[in-house]
């Protein structure tokens, strides 16, 4: 259920009009085809997970990690809005947060996966690559997400955005693994997705009888925060890592002294992810009712106090996306998101509507999912974008789309989609002064191949004259060639700068010397493009 009355204010309109296109990423890939792709990074033997000495055997089983590419082709500005296909706001809000995740977006723009993907059918990584590339290279447009993104999840009703988010992340993680079913457990923790979103919990139990210590390490892709008694994300994190006393019926059975003894259990972050997904537990597991309370969250978050190793410096994260639910239950309401473009401007992504907003508006929401990225990672990717090439000229994607379509269809089955509807792409127009208009006319006047009386050069071939000009009063119906001659004569003052775009209405306003000052109230010619 989409409730427009629940929308929050504080933003100003960014796009004055939306351009709806079909689900085809050709225009986005056209730009990538015209530029050289970054070389694949060599395999790195460095393990970013700082494992303890007792975990050295496990570390040797981990697959070598690939360095995530830094793409110089990622646009700095905001991309497209997403069309709501009916109770799909949860999908749109989640996809926008993933689209503006810098490490994931840059990897997708490199097309590294689709060039080596061996899966006979569509995989989530290939599908997400097409979506992210297309969305980031379609500013001012409204695009329709591929149905393959929610295949097996969407059932035609409102779903939980966090569940869909983790469904997509898990599907991308599985797409990174080999095709065979038997995969080593530790190999799952070295995939591209785990490099971006993954970290490691450290659960430490200390026996208060023999002072023995037992450590358990578990991977994670997101962190759920209990906000029942917390007024801020910082308080929720402090409660999460607060030591827990195990005694009485919950006494710990120590493996060293072989006794049931009181113990202390502490949960900390052993390694923190590049991208941190914090989920505020707002919905009841039983009833689905929402805990509608304001929980403060900062623009910059220091995660060092919650790490197992306290001897290092600050570990600062910056906020780049917020997923919001407006409503009273997980079964209804409306989802939208806020994202931070690489240029630093925040935008509200509400299905097809894209509006610029302030950081004050972003921090005042009843957030459901928070997306943080390490400050060093954000600065590294921002520097990469700032060194990128200059923006393309308007309309360049339309020129090269047809030339690249054949090559795109050979890349991977997931990248194939219906054709773009050319009628829905608007052309840019440029204003011109009278002096600017006269100058090219004088330059072109001496060229013999240019015929100013030839109307075909300035009017589209599918023009139908509804109202004839004022010269028709002196004609007879059996002289069509005379009508055509006068129509050509009336077009002498029109130039290519005033050519009529397909799908618009135009009127011939030029007058010949013979009719100057006469018949001021006669009808002008009205043209319709079919």
Swiss-Prot record:
Q: What is this protein called?
A: Ubiquitin carboxyl-terminal hydrolase 17
Which keywords describe this protein according to UniProt?
Apoptosis, Cell cycle, Endoplasmic reticulum, Hydrolase, Nucleus, Protease, Thiol protease, Ubl conjugation pathway
Which species is this record about? Homo sapiens (Human)
Q: Which residues form the USP domain?
A: 80-375
Q: What is its EC number?
A: 3.4.19.12
On the tree of life, the source organism's domain of life is Eukaryota
Q: Where in the cell is it found?
A: Nucleus; Endoplasmic reticulum
Q: Where is the composition biased (Basic and acidic residues)?
A: 382-392, 398-413
Q: Which residues form the active site?
A: 89, 334
One example of the protein's molecular function in GO is: cysteine-type deubiquitinase activity
Residue spans of biased composition, Polar residues class: 498-510
Where is region (Disordered) located?
382-416, 490-530
* Residue spans of biased composition, Basic residues class: 511-524
Q: What family name appears in the similarity comment?
A: Belongs to the peptidase C19 family. USP17 subfamily.
Q: Which reaction does it catalyse?
A: Thiol-dependent hydrolysis of ester, thioester, amide, peptide and isopeptide bonds formed by the C-terminal Gly of ubiquitin (a 76-residue protein attached to proteins as an intracellular targeting signal)
Subunit details for this protein? Interacts with SUDS3; the interaction is direct.
Which Gene3D superfamilies does the protein's record reference? Answer: Cysteine proteinases
Q: What else is known?
A: Overexpressed in a subset of human breast cancers, overexpression leading to an abnormally high level of CDC25A, which arrests cells through replication stress or premature mitosis, the latter occurring when CDK1 is activated inappropriately.
Q: Which Pfam families match?
A: UCH
Name the GO cellular-component terms.
Answer: cytosol; endoplasmic reticulum membrane; nucleus
Function of the molecule: Deubiquitinating enzyme that removes conjugated ubiquitin from specific proteins to regulate different cellular processes. Regulates cell proliferation by deubiquitinating and inhibiting RCE1 thereby controlling the small GTPases NRAS and HRAS localization and activation. In parallel, mediates deubiquitination of CDC25A, preventing CDC25A degradation by the proteasome during the G1/S and G2/M phases promoting cell-cycle progression. Also regulates cell proliferation and apoptosis through deubiquitination of SUDS3 a regulator of histone deacetylation.
* PANTHER family with a match to the protein in the record: INACTIVE UBIQUITIN CARBOXYL-TERMINAL HYDROLASE 17-LIKE PROTEIN 4-RELATED, UBIQUITIN CARBOXYL-TERMINAL HYDROLASE
């Amino acid at each position: 259920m989409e409730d427009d009355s629940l929308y929050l204010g504080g933003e100003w309109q960014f796009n004055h009009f939306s351009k709806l296109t079909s689900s085809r990423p050709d225009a986005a890939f056209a730009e990538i085809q015209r530029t050289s792709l970054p070389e694949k990074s060599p395999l790195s033997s460095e393990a970013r997970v700082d494992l303890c000495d007792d975990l050295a055997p496990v570390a040797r089983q981990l697959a070598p990690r690939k360095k995530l590419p830094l793409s110089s082709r990622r646009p700095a500005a905001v991309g497209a809005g997403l069309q709501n296909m009916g109770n799909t706001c949860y999908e749109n809000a989640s996809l926008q947060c993933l689209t503006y995740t810098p490490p994931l977006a840059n990897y997708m723009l490199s097309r590294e996966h689709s060039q080596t993907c061996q899966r006979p059918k569509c995989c989530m990584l290939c599908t997400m690559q097409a979506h992210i590339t297309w969305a980031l290279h379609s500013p001012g447009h409204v695009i329709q997400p591929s149905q393959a993104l929610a295949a097996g999840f969407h059932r035609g009703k409102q779903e939980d955005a966090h569940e869909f988010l983790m469904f997509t992340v898990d599907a991308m993680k599985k797409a990174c693994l080999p095709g065979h079913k038997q995969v080593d457990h530790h190999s799952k923790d070295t995939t591209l997705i785990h490099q971006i979103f993954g970290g490691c919990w450290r659960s430490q139990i200390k026996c208060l009888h023999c002072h023995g210590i037992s450590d358990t390490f578990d991977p994670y892709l997101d962190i759920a925060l209990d906000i029942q008694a917390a007024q801020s994300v910082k308080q929720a994190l402090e409660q999460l890592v607060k030591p827990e006393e195990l005694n009485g019926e919950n006494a710990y059975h120590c493996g060293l002294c072989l006794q049931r003894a009181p113990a202390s259990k502490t949960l900390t972050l052993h390694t923190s992810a590049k991208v941190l997904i914090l989920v505020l537990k707002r919905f009841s597991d039983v009833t689905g009712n929402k805990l509608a309370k304001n929980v403060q969250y900062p623009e910059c978050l220091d995660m060092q106090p919650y790490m197992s190793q306290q001897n290092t410096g600050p570990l600062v994260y910056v906020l780049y996306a917020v997923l919001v639910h407006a409503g009273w239950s997980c079964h209804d309401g409306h989802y939208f998101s806020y994202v931070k473009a690489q240029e630093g401007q925040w935008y509200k992504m509400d299905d097809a509507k894209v509006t610029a907003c302030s950081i004050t508006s972003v921090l005042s929401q009843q957030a459901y999912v928070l997306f943080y990225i390490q400050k060093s990672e954000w600065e590294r990717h921002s520097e990469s974008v700032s060194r990128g090439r200059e923006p393309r000229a308007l309309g360049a994607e339309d020129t090269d789309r047809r030339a690249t379509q054949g090559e795109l269809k050979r890349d991977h089955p997931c990248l194939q989609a219906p054709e773009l509807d050319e009628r829905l792409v608007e052309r840019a127009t440029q204003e011109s002064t009278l002096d600017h208009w006269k100058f090219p006319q004088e330059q072109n006047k001496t060229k013999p191949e240019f015929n100013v009386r030839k109307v075909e050069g300035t009017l589209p071939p599918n023009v139908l004259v509804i109202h004839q000009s004022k010269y028709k009063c002196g004609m007879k119906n059996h002289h069509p060639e005379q009508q055509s001659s006068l129509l050509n004569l009336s077009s002498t003052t029109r130039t290519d700068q005033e050519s009529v775009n397909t799908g618009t209405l135009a009127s011939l306003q030029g007058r010949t010397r013979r009719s100057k000052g006469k018949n001021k109230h006669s009808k002008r010619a009205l043209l319709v493009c079919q």
